[in-house]
């Protein structure tokens, strides 16, 4: 029996399953294709959180974690757990890169600038990592300025006051908050440089809104109608900007939303916007490595481990062709993260990125660029590729807005694209796995507060086999089982590094 061609992995980003219909965009939306597949095709569920994806118990998954595990075909220990462990066991203060940072800042008589997410969301950063770093640096007698990035997306939309209060209560005498900035400005990943400039101008030059203290900055933003994600860059007290000899330490452990702001703050030759005169930093440190380009001007406390024989690498090594497609918001996930943290395409790997719409928030255009993704996906299905990986961003990105009606519209647009993909795969004689990397839009109201729910969930996600082998059934599993499943459909052996198990029971 010949292998189906192409084999398609269709990732419905943020499409989780929840029995209750209330505030459940997936259940309330009109999804004839998804409903038909669930009724007629082999299906099961996958776990996308906690130890099953290399995270601490109870920690929700996210797109970086999800796509890394999917591409690796094994559970990959993620940075959050590794950093938590280093802090818990006491090795963090002795981290060699951190010791080097301390030595350089001390030698120059500088101040340490720490930028980090002030929440316990654990997707891009964690308040406890920030507090621990402050303690270490202050313990060395180094003055510390914190650039507090408020969240409101991976935690409740108006929880920043609580987190900022938690932070300032434990600050040693030599540490202070210099700026308070919503992640909308400081953590863009779509080249919206006007936003990034406002964030970096506040950190570098102390320009923006002003408040007497950090808690007042949050309160003033709320009074202006800004929830935590959107807090306008605010300078706190008499903070006057960064100076020559200072050091900069980024506490974010996820790359995609740290790259732009770090480039603006420290990349030599940066010209995407006018940064003004930047300081001559004595040291520039990241919690992790963010890209090859960033490695040229900064060091990493916890470099990423090398993941060998990912799905893409293994398929390429067998001389087969593959195609990756997503819109801008999720393009790094189906390329960089799926390939184990490598930017360059594999041999025989083609890519297409649809430009995400330039709107302030995606509830304003819930279809996003899904029609363009669908057009190019259908074209690719008929183009002779062996493996295609596609990500539909809408359920996650619109889910993050907390707008139920918009999330339903997003789900319906993706279902239309899914219908086109199923038809094209069937015509081509291919097979498809439909799944998600984590949940989100199936829970649009916070059950505890009754307000909008904007974060990911720990709900199971679907996995559906379309046009699989006759009599095949699926069993429940985790994201690391997807690559072995795809390889089985492609009739390729599984590399020994992949410890996941195929979900197909023939």
UniProtKB/Swiss-Prot annotation:
Organism: Cereibacter sphaeroides (strain KD131 / KCTC 12085)
Gene3D superfamilies per UniProt: Alkaline Phosphatase, subunit A (3.40.720.10), BPG-independent phosphoglycerate mutase, domain B (3.40.1450.10)
Molecular function terms from GO: manganese ion binding; phosphoglycerate mutase activity
UniProt xrefs under CDD domains: iPGM
Residues given in the record as substrate binding sites: 124, 153-154, 183, 189, 254-257, 330
Catalytic activities: (2R)-2-phosphoglycerate = (2R)-3-phosphoglycerate
Sites where the protein binds Mn(2+) 2: 13, 63, 437-438
Residue numbers annotated as active site: 63
Database matches in HAMAP family: GpmI (MF_01038)
Required cofactor names: Mn(2+)
UniProt keyword Metal-binding present: yes
Coiled coil: none
Biological or metabolic pathway of the protein: Carbohydrate degradation; glycolysis; pyruvate from D-glyceraldehyde 3-phosphate: step 3/5
UniProt function note: Catalyzes the interconversion of 2-phosphoglycerate and 3-phosphoglycerate.
SUPFAM superfamilies named in the record: 2,3-Bisphosphoglycerate-independent phosphoglycerate mutase, substrate-binding domain, Alkaline phosphatase-like
GO cellular component labels: cytosol
Cofactor note: Binds 2 manganese ions per subunit.
InterPro entries membership: Alkaline_phosphatase_core_sf, BPG-indep_PGM_N, Metalloenzyme, PGAM_B_sf, Pgm_bpd_ind
Protein name: 2,3-bisphosphoglycerate-independent phosphoglycerate mutase
